[in-house]
Amino acid sequence: MVIHSGVDRHIRGQSAVMIWIHKSISNKIDHYKLWNNRVIETRMKTQRGHLTILAVYGVTEGREELNGVFYDTLEKILDIVNKNDYIMLIGDRNGRIGNNGVANIVGTNGEATAIYYRLTTIR
């Protein structure tokens, strides 16, 4: 099963996100929501409870007006996701790679992404 944000062909490469669910587990999907052309939420039943997958395509750093909308949307979703769910945040957050790591965060993320993670409980 493929869930796609469905952006028009003439803007392809600027923003779009997709999540692919193998057919053997597609019957486990509780629901999915296309929040916008950069964020898809998919909730699935697992043996240990529910898993919410947030597939994202972040804004390139330096585009502050779009960055604000992107992170506001992500924060809104995280506020309403069931607090007992496991959360998997996947995708391309388009951060510029640096050499400085951030405590409790895997990888050398872009500045906006690192700041966001420091301000939220996602680690």
Predicted regions and their residues:
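A shared catalytic/ligand-binding motif for oxyanion handling
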Residues: 1-123
